[in-house]
């Protein structure tokens, strides 16, 4: 079958106890990026009595995690998703919410529901909220980023998902800190480099209408004013030829704009670009070539923040500013998975994100009052405060 790490076993035990209890509120578990969440989900689902429905956030992640489930030796499982032309129901059913929402009656007999990436659940409405409300099922959510953006006339705020109004998830039943996993050797150490271009000024960036991030227009204007593109290309070239002569195990660049990514792919040798418009077969070809070293640099726009599993990757270039803690964490998390083929991951930030959020390994879940969870960085609150 498979062998769980101690914290994975604790997470699985807590989940099974939750489903077997008479708890009247739904719950979450917080497991950092790289902690093996898919393995924990597989173990939970396999141990539970009755039928278990596992929601995955996208067809790509569903396909990846279902394959892992089968590889662990779990056989009584199936996929219910139009994207796979498969609507089979088994003891363990992996699904996307879009395929299930119009066929809720087929799942009323399910005892247990697990939602992967549960921070995507909108308590104020949407398909998840409708499914949970109408089926009255018992739900466990798992996520590495347990917060959602809330906006009002007072501004924007990241709210811990057990503190939203209305509320779907009522309590945290298990969490493990990033720093704990680093100390146990289950995550890779990271070195950070803040390398902004000369003259870069965040004060020139403007918030969008929700306050959740910066406007495209203000970012474009600031990038043009300081010739950000030339700086980005120079940084990537320096990373390709480091002073110590040690070749990096892949350089993954995150940009905001498609045209910018296309230019980088054209101007840097052994570089390719992927975006939401890249065909699946072409994306797989590029990423496989990236993993073998045939392609040394991949520039991406709006993808590869989740579901891209390449533990050997050791260099991230953050070439976009963001006000999204989730996005920052997800991007940095691409380099935090351990591998015997890398000593440390490098995070090269060109746009002030490091100053805004701090190092990912310094993020911590704290509970100053019972069930009043928040995320802090070196003691500075990042959730449940206006920004």
Q: Where are these predicted regions, by residue range?
A:
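Conserved pre-motif I regulatory segment
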Residues: 1-30
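Walker A/P-loop
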Residues: 22-44, 254, 274, 299
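Conserved Walker A/P-loop ATP-binding site and its immediately adjacent core
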Residues: 33, 38-71, 256-258
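Conserved helicase ATPase core of P-loop NTP-dependent helicases/translocases
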Residues: 63, 78-89, 252, 260-263, ...
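Inter-Walker segment of RecA-like/P-loop motor cores
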Residues: 71-105
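Conserved RecA-like P-loop NTPase helicase motor core
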Residues: 98-104, 121, 275-369
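Post-DEXD/H (motif II) to motif III coupling segment of the RecA-like Helicase ATP-binding lobe
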Residues: 120-191
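Conserved interdomain linker/interface between the two RecA-like ATPase lobes of SF2 helicase motors
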Residues: 167-252
């Amino acid at each position: 079958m498979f062998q769980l790490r101690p914290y994975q076993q604790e997470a699985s035990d807590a989940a099974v106890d939750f489903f077997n209890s008479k708890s009247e509120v739904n719950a979450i578990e917080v497991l950092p990026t790289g902690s093996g969440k898919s393995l924990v989900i597989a173990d939970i689902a396999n141990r539970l009595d009755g039928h278990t429905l596992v929601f995955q956030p996208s067809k790509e992640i569903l396909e990846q995690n279902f394959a892992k489930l089968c590889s662990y030796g779990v056989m009584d499982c199936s996929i219910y998703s139009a994207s796979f032309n498969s609507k089979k129901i088994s003891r363990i059913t992996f699904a996307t919410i879009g395929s299930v929402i119009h066929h809720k009656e087929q799942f009323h007999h399910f005892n247990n529901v697990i939602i992967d990436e549960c921070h995507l659940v909108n308590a104020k409405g949407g398909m998840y909220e409708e499914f949970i409300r109408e089926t009255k099922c018992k739900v466990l959510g798992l996520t590495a980023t347990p917060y959602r953006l809330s906006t009002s006339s007072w501004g924007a705020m990241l709210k811990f998902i057990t503190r939203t109004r209305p509320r779907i998830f009522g309590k945290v039943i298990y969490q493990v800190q990033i720093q704990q996993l680093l100390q146990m050797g289950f995550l890779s150490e990271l070195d950070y480099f803040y390398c902004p271009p000369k003259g870069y000024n965040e004060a020139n960036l403007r918030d969008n209408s929700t306050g959740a991030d910066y406007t495209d227009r203000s970012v474009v204007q600031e990038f043009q004013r300081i010739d950000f593109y030339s700086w980005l290309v120079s940084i990537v070239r320096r990373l390709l030829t480091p002073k110590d002569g040690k070749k990096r195990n892949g350089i993954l660049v995150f940009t905001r704009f498609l045209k910018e990514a296309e230019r980088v792919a054209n101007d840097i040798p052994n570089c390719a670009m992927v975006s939401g418009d890249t065909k699946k077969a072409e994306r797989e070809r590029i990423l496989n070539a990236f993993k073998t070293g045939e392609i040394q640099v991949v520039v991406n726009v709006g993808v590869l923040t989740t579901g891209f599993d390449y533990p050997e990757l050791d260099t991230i270039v953050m070439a976009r500013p963001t006000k999204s803690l989730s996005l920052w964490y997800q991007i940095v998390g691409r380099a935090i998975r351990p591998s015997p083929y890398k000593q440390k991951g490098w995070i090269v930030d060109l746009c002030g994100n490091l100053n805004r959020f701090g190092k990912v390994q310094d993020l911590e879940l704290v509970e100053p009052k019972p069930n009043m969870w928040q995320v802090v960085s070196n003691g500075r609150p990042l959730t449940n405060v206006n920004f």
